[in-house]
Amino acid sequence: MKIIRRRVIAAANAAFGVLLGAMMAVPLGAARAEDQTYVMKITTPTIHDVPDTYADIFAAAVEKASGGRIKADVYPASQLGTIPRQIEGTQFGSTQMAVIPSEFWVGVDQRFQVTAAPGLVDSMAQGQKLTADPAVRKLMLSLGADKGLHGVGLFMAEPSDVIAKTPIRHLADFKGKKLRTFASRFQTESFGRLGVTAVVMSLGDVLPALQQGTIDGSVAGMGPFTKMHFIDAAKYVTMINQPGIFVVAEVNRKWFEALPKDLQDIIDKEGAAQSIAINSMALDLRSKAEANWTASGGEAINLPADEQASMMQTLSSVGADVSKTDPQLAEAYKILTDAAQRARAGM
């Protein structure tokens, strides 16, 4: 959005004198704080999907609420580098904000990955209730505070599915596959139990890896599969709906703390408000992605009901098994599972 600066031109000496007197009556620091424009570069790995849609509505909201004092520019589709580079840029200040699935922040704090525990949520509605839980928000948005980050947003994008070059119609078809996963031990352990070799990879690298045969498939959401033209390399998506893909919005802490207090409040307020506003959009985008996938010639596959249940039984202990390796991780896992139960009970 374009920032328009107002210019005042003194047409006569008398008018200039009045203006100069008024300006001198205002403390210099206050005038500077009001007039300064703060550039906010926002990075995200997706395009025309839930994370970048959140970035867009957040950017518009903070520009409006700040009266143009914050100029927010969104860089979707990993324009500012791979996911690890986007995270580093946000930590160290070359980028002011990143909107990225929480598991990829695991290098900052391993507790970011707890959202990837299989079976945590059964639906997007439950996932959206989970992200609104005060205990969950307090935990997730506090992570990384000692590593240069300030959390402002948390929401569920969609469930995970698996795209593959050959169809995965049964649990047995997972065995021996090399699949890209997110950067989470919860995911690598889960798919390992299904006989998969997990390969952690940034989203922008997945399509070339599929085309080159480096991997057999990938875990991601229907949004990226459709919007990033994955059908050029693979046409089969198995709708396992696990785990949920949760996204955090992190701001560079040093940049944030240097802002005037009123602008800090706007960023925090809009981060939370747009985390709620995105929910209906996420549901709509998911529905359209599913329809677009089949309309473009892709196939959406559901495991037989008994095999889906068997898969969930196989994965049921992953969360506890992975989290028990570290007390902090175990505590975070308990906070999320307790909140998930509250969300489930309230539906």
Protein language model features and the residues they cover:
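Local alpha-helix boundary/kink/capping signal
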Residues: 20-21, 28, 333
